[in-house]
Structure formats: structure tokens, C-alpha cells
């Protein structure tokens, strides 16, 4: 057994069938973890997506639920506990991003983003920590924030705000739950080569020029490097960390981009 061995970890990850989530799930399974993947997509679609990413391992299970809804989250935990046992690591990873100039950002889209990025993280973290306290489990919460918690990126202002708020949420859980042996940390990736950022990088020269300038290391972040951060935070190597943000952004937050 090594310090990065996760065979004693049962991990629930929300948003686990998404572009980054699938890579994280694969890495967790490769390091021996039992992984409960939560997302909103139908099970057959999720299984295909996970399989295409090489993440549909024997110790990986899928659980469909809307993580913004407390009743559904309670049912999710009941189902996970019945199937693989009570998770001792819960990753609040579900999230979304959309791009509009700040004065053109529709309020209904702002509400939807905050609902998923922030409310869901609170609902899931609260459900997990209540169960850990009841069962005297020293659990670990991991929140996915972003480098834009510190350096706002243009045209995604609500996303920037949601990630800054998520850092505060994480630190609140860490502060209040430490007496119960429960830890909370966050991971803050940079400009990852998936989803909207990758599409804009490939199709919009102005975005690529701006993003290239914002990344001191000069290239988009591979999702595998984000997964490496999750492995570290889940491992015994990070056992004395709580209330901390693991910033792995290629240097994006070192200075303003303009």
C-alpha cells in the first residue's frame, strides 16, 4: 500500500459523468477507490460516457439524481449506502458555466447557475456531514472551485461569484465540523481543455489569444491534471489539510490578464 492508495475510500462525486468528472472517476478507480457517480443524465447515457472515458470499472456505480433537491439527495445517499456503503469522501463537483457580457446576463440563467454551482454543493455537503456525525465517521468534503475565485474572467461573472462563494462555503464546513473529525477542502483548476473553454479555444481566435495570455504555462490544462489533484486530496498525504484550496491553475491567478 502506498500513500496514494485509495482502497479504503468510498467516494461519491456529483457531476461525475461530465467531461472533467469522468476523468476524475477513472483516476479514483485506478487508485483503488469505490466510486459512486452522481449526475442528472439518464443511466444508459452516463454509462456510455463513463465507458468511453475508461471510467466504467467494476467498483464504479452510477446514481441518477438532481443534487439541487434535498429530498432527492437524501434518496441518493440512501441508495448509495444500500449499494456500496456510506461514502467517506464526498466530492461536490457538479457545476455549469455560460458566457454573457455582465449587463446582458439573463437573471434566470444566473439563478440556474447559482442553483447548481452553490446550492447543490451546500445540499450535498450538508447531507453527507449529517450522516457522518450520526455514524461517527471522519469524512472528507471536496469542493470544486476555480482560479476565477480570485481573478474574475470576463463574461462569466456569475460563475466567478459562485466559485468565490464556494470557497467560503467550504471553509465554513471545515471550521464548524472539525470537532467531529470532518474535513473540507477545495480544488481550484485553471482553464481546462474541455467543454465551453475548449470549444472557444478551438473556434474563437480572440478567446484563444486572451486565454493564452492568461496562462503563464502556455497551454490549456489537461483534465488528467485535475484528477491528480483529487487523488492527492483523497489520499492520506492530505490527511492534515482542512479549509484549504489546492490551486492548480498553470499560474492563471498569478496576475491580471490585461
Model regions: which residues?
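Active-site loop-to-helix junction immediately N-terminal to the catalytic Tyr of the SDR YXXXK motif
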Residues: 105, 152-160, 172, 200, ...
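Substrate-binding pocket helix/loop in short-chain dehydrogenase/reductase
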Residues: 101-102, 106-114, 211
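Canonical Rossmann dinucleotide-binding motif of NAD(H)/NADP(H)-dependent dehydrogenases/reductases
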Residues: 5-36
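Short C-terminal tail/terminal secondary-structure segment
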Residues: 2, 151, 231, 242-258
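Active-site helix of classical SDR
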Residues: 125, 162, 170
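Active-site loop of short-chain dehydrogenase/reductase
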Residues: 9, 62, 86-87, 132-145, ...
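Alpha-helical segment proximal to the catalytic Tyr-Lys
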Residues: 130, 175-179, 239
